[in-house]
């Protein structure tokens, strides 16, 4: 149902907590595979990803083309893009599955995408800042991840070779197709 794509480069310390948070999704049958698109790391990033059972692609490409190439190998019909160090809250599996099922049941020609809420639920300061950013028209941050139908991702042309590749993709998805999930993310550095 879901292929997770993570672009890494010397990310050994940040990758482990991100992968640990995905175990519940794999156990529940939501996560089909995790693809790590690595840019020739010199630390233990590749060893950690390999030991965790991830598909590791060694791609000496800029971030955008690396993400696009990794997404091109994905076998699931939905993609979840995460940055190393982003840890999803424990309720992410149920909410993500519900979001995907609702979109697929509606067979809406305007297939939607979703981002996770910035910060853990109950963190008043982070929630207030995220609401203020949204009210002022700011786009979600790359640390919020992105759940997107592979068909929509492909139709949009995927990630491009631009400076803020995640933000560029979100803008092409558009506000009307973008849903903000209640599940939060926690950034680990």
Which residue stretches match the model-derived regions?
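Acidic donor-binding/catalytic loop of UDP-sugar-dependent glycosyltransferases
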Residues: 44, 64, 82-99
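Conserved donor NDP-sugar-binding/catalytic core segment of glycosyltransferases
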Residues: 91-124
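Short, well-formed alpha-helical segments that are part of the catalytic scaffolds
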Residues: 10-26
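A conserved acidic beta->alpha catalytic loop
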Residues: 38-46
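Glycine-rich, basic loop-to-helix element that forms the pyrophosphate-binding segment
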Residues: 59-74
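Cell-envelope/extracellular polymer assembly enzymes that use nucleotide-activated donors
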Residues: 1-3, 33
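Short aromatic/hydrophobic "clamp" motif used to bind/position activated sugar donors
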Residues: 79
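A recurrent flexible, glycine/aromatic-enriched loop bordering the glycosyltransferase active site
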Residues: 109-121, 130-155, 186
């Amino acid at each position: 149902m879901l292929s997770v794509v993570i672009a890494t480069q010397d990310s050994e310390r940040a990758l482990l907590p991100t992968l640990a948070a995905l175990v519940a999704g794999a156990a529940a049958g939501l996560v089909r595979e995790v693809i790590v698109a690595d840019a020739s790391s010199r630390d233990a990033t590749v060893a950690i990803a390999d030991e965790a059972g991830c598909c590791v692609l060694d791609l000496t490409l800029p971030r955008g083309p690396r993400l696009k190439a990794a997404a091109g190998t994905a076998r699931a019909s939905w993609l979840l893009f995460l940055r190393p160090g982003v840890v999803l809250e424990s309720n992410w599996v149920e909410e993500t599955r519900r979001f995907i099922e609702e979109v697929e049941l509606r067979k809406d020609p305007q297939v939607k995408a979703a981002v996770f809420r910035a910060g853990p639920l109950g963190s008043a300061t982070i929630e207030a800042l995220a609401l203020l950013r949204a009210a002022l028209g700011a786009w979600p941050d790359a640390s919020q991840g992105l759940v997107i139908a592979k068909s929509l991702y492909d139709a949009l042309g995927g990630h491009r070779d631009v400076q803020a590749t995640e933000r560029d993709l979100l803008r092409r998805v558009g506000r009307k197709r973008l849903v903000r999930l209640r599940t939060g993310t926690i950034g680990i550095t």
